[in-house]
Amino acid sequence: MLDAFSKVITSADGKAAYVGGADLQALKKFVSDGNKRMDAVNAIVSNASCIVSDAVSGMVCENPALIAPNGGVYSNRKMAACLRDAEIILRYVSYSLLSGDSSVLEDRCLNGLKETYASLGVPAAGNARAVAIMKATVNGFINNTAQQKKLSTPAGDCSALASEAGGYFDKVSSALA
């Protein structure tokens, strides 16, 4: 996993150059937005169980066949696995948002995800829908538009962070497609 600083240093070192110019400005912006970034991650982490359960519930409500016999999440064991997997995805998205880099998500979560689900007979469409619901919910928490929130969320314009988080969820959706 490379954070924003490691990426810039690795790039500059590869060119045998000093860190400067646009790279330095990008790091300054990353640092100045650090509190917003941490508040956004805190909003996700503090509401993780609700985000995950709402996403899985929404997926099931839209496709009740999933909980019918032989459905993708029929049985307590399969439902528990579904909730666990959604929680893992959300956790790695939060890691990526905190570090400003998607490599931890790609390396530790998405690598082989589609093949694993296919081998287990888990329907990809349902997973993709749960990810889309999580993306929308996280967007609401980061942009401070979530209804009935319990905790304060990031102050100021956080649209860039919401867009960044959305990009991480898009990577998950692409990996499942």
Swiss-Prot record:
The entry's (2R,3E)-phycocyanobilin 3-binding residues are: 77, 82, 84-85
Record membrane topology? Peripheral membrane protein
Q: Which Pfam families match?
A: Phycobilisome (PF00502)
**Binding, (2R,3E)-phycocyanobilin 1:** 18
Where do the annotations place 15,16-dihydrobiliverdin binding? 50, 54, 61, 129, 148-149
Question: What more does the record tell us?
Answer: The light-harvesting system in Cryptophytes contains phycobiliprotein complexes. Unusually they are composed of either phycoerythrin (CPE) or phycocyanin (CPC) but never allophycocyanin (APC), with only one type of biliprotein being present in any one species. Unlike cyanobacteria or red algae these proteins are not arranged into higher-order phycobilisome complexes, and they are found in the thylakoid lumen.
The annotated subunit structure for this chain is: Heterotetramer of 2 identical alpha chains and 2 identical beta chains which form 2 alpha-beta heterodimers within the heterotetramer. The two alpha-beta heterodimers are rotated to an open configuration in contrast to the closed configuration found in other cryptophyte species due to the insertion of a single amino acid, 'Asp-65', in a conserved region of the alpha chain. In the open form, the central chromophores are not in physical contact but are separated by a water-filled channel.
- What this protein is called in its record is Phycoerythrin beta subunit
Q: Which organism is it from?
A: Hemiselmis virescens
- Lineage, highest ranks first: Eukaryota, Cryptophyceae, Cryptomonadales, Hemiselmidaceae, Hemiselmis
Q: Which gene encodes it?
A: cpeB
